[in-house]
Structure formats: C-alpha cells, structure tokens
C-alpha cells in the first residue's frame, strides 16, 4: 500500500532508496566521495593507455602507464579509506537512523491509510445524501 502517493506528502518517501535502481545509489555515493570515481577513471585511463602502448610496441610508455595504474589504484584506495573515515558514522548510529526512517515511513503509511478511510466515509455519506435526494425527488 505504501506504493501509492499520499495527498499530503510531497513524494519524498524514505523507502525510495530501497526501491530505486542501483545507479541512483551509485550517484549518491559518488556525491559523498567524489575522489573515488575520479581515481577509478584515472586507473581505467592508465590501463587503456598502457594497452595502447603495448599494441604500438612502445614498452617504455607501457611500463610508465602500468606504474601510473598502480599509483592511481593506491590513491583510489586511500581516497576510499579517507572518505570512509571522514564521512563514516558509527554503525550503531546508522542502524538507529534506519530505524527512525522506518518508523517515519510506518507513521506516514498509517496517516495515509487514515486519510483514505476518511475519504471513503465522505464518499459513502455523499452517496447516501444523493440517494436520499433522489428518493425525495421521486416522491414529489
């Protein structure tokens, strides 16, 4: 039932992260730690350039690019560890945050169901009034 939108909610659901495709999570992580994707791109670039140098037969350039690839991989791992230390939270805090988000989602769902029930009662009351009005018109 939580898949349906609520009239009082602006559409930002807590469970969107769980239901969103993987690339949204990747984009979110890239925004959190922008040095890691840059390091990955640099590593891939060095690998591609080393393969190209090997194809041409330039051993010196290929060797430099292999060295650059290892250096970029090391910098990427360092950025990953540094970002984890800088942005990292205590696992207990993350668990508590998830629990709060789940409770908020349950509360929103409960409010949404109450709103649907209230609207259903309003519709039923309107139908009763319309039926009573029709019956009065038929009697006249």
Curated annotation (Swiss-Prot):
Q: Which UniProt keywords apply?
A: Membrane, Mitochondrion, Transmembrane, Transmembrane helix
Q: How does it sit in the membrane?
A: Multi-pass membrane protein
Q: PROSITE patterns recorded for this chain?
A: HIG1
Domain named HIG1: residues: 7-98
CC terms in the record's Gene Ontology section: mitochondrial inner membrane; mitochondrion; respiratory chain complex
Query: Which compartment or compartments is the protein found in?
Result: Mitochondrion membrane
| A Gene Ontology biological process term | mitochondrial cytochrome c oxidase assembly
Which positions form S-S bridges?
none
Q: Does the keyword Transmembrane apply?
A: yes
| Listed transmembrane segments | 35-54, 66-88
What family is it from? Belongs to the RCF1 family.
What job does this protein perform?
Answer: Cytochrome c oxidase subunit which plays a role in assembly of respiratory supercomplexes.
Q: Indicate the quaternary assembly.
A: Associates with the respiratory chain complex III/complex IV supercomplex.
Protein name, UniProt field: Respiratory supercomplex factor 1, mitochondrial
Q: Which gene encodes it?
A: RCF1
